[in-house]
Amino acid sequence: MSDILKKIETYKLEEIAAAKAKVSLADLKAMAADQSAPRGFYKALRAKQAAGKFGLIAEIKKASPSKGLIRPDFDPPALAAAYEAGGAACLSVLTDTPSFQGAPEFLTAARNACALPALRKDFMFDTYQVHEARAWGADCILLIMASLSDDEAKRLEDEAFALGMDVLIEVHDAEETERALKLTSPLLGINNRNLRTFEVGLETSEKLAGLVPADKLLVGESGIFTFEDCQRLEKSGISTFLVGESLMRKDDVTAATKALLTGHSGILAAE
């Protein structure tokens, strides 16, 4: 695990302990049970693929550790509606506060403003967080293999499946990919950002895609800015993408989303 991930794990475990002291697991489960049924994150992405279209998981992200504030006029419901109008299949909403200025209410508000399924984008370590995600309305959770043991990942995946949620498993290298393939979820995200150096290169997706069976749905993450980037990754069998910062920086998010997915409205600026 990188030093960055270790620091995140430290504050995350403190957060989880504090949350458990405020809201019992029983109360959290009751809140989750009151939510409407999960919308089908994986199903929405497969539908785009079946229609011969690129599938986009559009990210709602206010800030990042490396770039600071990304979007000053941050309005999750408006962004969710803009992404939906632009043709996105799903949402990804940051709920981590210390590193990304995210919040649970951003997830709930964004999902309520559209018909798209939503991913809770956060660092998951405890099954309590899975119930939090469902209580806030999430349809999918993220598991980052770089920060989890095989047993931890399996436990979190099982908990999510029990709640009817989908699971996006994120990998960065061949070893993590091999471990991820032991899990059940058909959703596998390849992050093109090296968590140790923070360098980004689409070669990571191109290299790792060949290690993954055809029945998995591959998601390219990080470093995707243009329709041409999407076309490049499509040659490696990747037609679904998670994109945030490059879209979040645009004044017209709907137009930028359409441009990314169809190539009809120009090029997105690089980070």
From Swiss-Prot:
GO biological process: one example: L-tryptophan biosynthetic process
Pathway(s) where this gene product acts: Amino-acid biosynthesis; L-tryptophan biosynthesis; L-tryptophan from chorismate: step 4/5
Top enzyme category: lyase
InterPro entries, sorted: Aldolase_TIM (IPR013785), Indole-3-glycerol_P_synth (IPR045186), Indole-3-glycerol_P_synth_dom (IPR013798), Indole-3-GlycerolPSynthase_CS (IPR001468), RibuloseP-bd_barrel (IPR011060)
Listed Pfam families: IGPS (PF00218)
UniProt catalytic activity: 1-(2-carboxyphenylamino)-1-deoxy-D-ribulose 5-phosphate + H(+) = (1S,2R)-1-C-(indol-3-yl)glycerol 3-phosphate + CO2 + H2O
GO molecular function, one term: indole-3-glycerol-phosphate synthase activity
Keywords of this entry: Amino-acid biosynthesis, Aromatic amino acid biosynthesis, Decarboxylase, Lyase, Tryptophan biosynthesis
EC number of this enzyme: 4.1.1.48
Keyword Lyase found: yes
Entry similarity comment: Belongs to the TrpC family.
Family annotation (HAMAP family): IGPS_B (MF_00134_B)
Protein name: Indole-3-glycerol phosphate synthase
Organism whose genome encodes this protein: Agrobacterium fabrum (strain C58 / ATCC 33970) (Agrobacterium tumefaciens (strain C58))
